[in-house]
A protein has these predicted regions:
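A short beta-loop-alpha structural element at the N-terminal edge
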Residues: 3-16
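Active-site rim helix/loop that mediates acceptor-substrate recognition in acyltransferases
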Residues: 24-49, 65
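Conserved beta-strand in the GNAT
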Residues: 45, 51-62, 77, 82
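A conserved beta-turn-beta hairpin within the catalytic core of GNAT-like acetyltransferases
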Residues: 61-78, 88, 110, 143
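A short, internal acetyl-CoA/4′-phosphopantetheine-binding micro-motif in the GNAT/acyltransferase core
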Residues: 80-88, 117-118
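Conserved active-site alpha-helix within GNAT-family acetyltransferase domains
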Residues: 94, 118-138
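Conserved GNAT acetyl-CoA-binding A-motif
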Residues: 104-118
């Protein structure tokens, strides 16, 4: 089964909303059920056999305001990434990140950051991001970590 990672297009919103509802119900669905999202967002999907099995949302015009930014803005910011639990450990999350990094490079964004979600599974998420080339840059508090990567 091949997985295609691409920019989200009209018609993907309901599939994104379903994925969020099933895999990350604490996330805000925003306008996805109505197939709407802000133009400034980079919205990527992983599609397998006609189903959305992965989703990444980020921005390429952000500004990291902490002390760890090594270059001036714009900075990329990965806001969220979700992969269908049954499809995990097959490279889909990594492929979504690589597609985002390609878009960041094309937009002349040199540095991308993210904040791994805390709580249950946080250590696994941090390991995944390290495996994807991100490194810890700053600790916001005892539970939140900033991770970043050069494009």
């Amino acid at each position: 089964m091949d997985t295609v990672v691409r920019e989200a297009v009209p018609g993907d919103g309901p599939g994104i909303a379903t994925l969020i509802t099933e895999e990350a119900p604490h996330f805000d669905l925003q306008g996805y059920p109505e197939d709407l999202w802000p133009d400034h967002l980079v919205v990527l999907v992983a599609e397998r056999e006609g189903h959305i099995v992965g989703w990444l949302e980020g921005i390429l015009d952000g500004e990291y305001e902490g002390s760890g930014a090594p270059v001036p803005p714009p900075h990329g910011y990965i806001l969220a990434i979700v992969v269908d639990e049954e499809q995990r450990h097959h490279g889909i999350g990594g492929d979504l990140i690589e597609k985002f990094m390609e878009e960041a490079l094309a937009a002349k964004v040199e540095w991308v950051f993210l904040i791994p979600e805390g709580g249950e599974g946080c250590e696994d998420r941090v390991r995944f991001f390290i495996h994807s080339g991100f490194t810890p840059t700053e600790v916001l508090d005892e539970k939140r970590l900033i991770m970043a990567r050069w494009t």
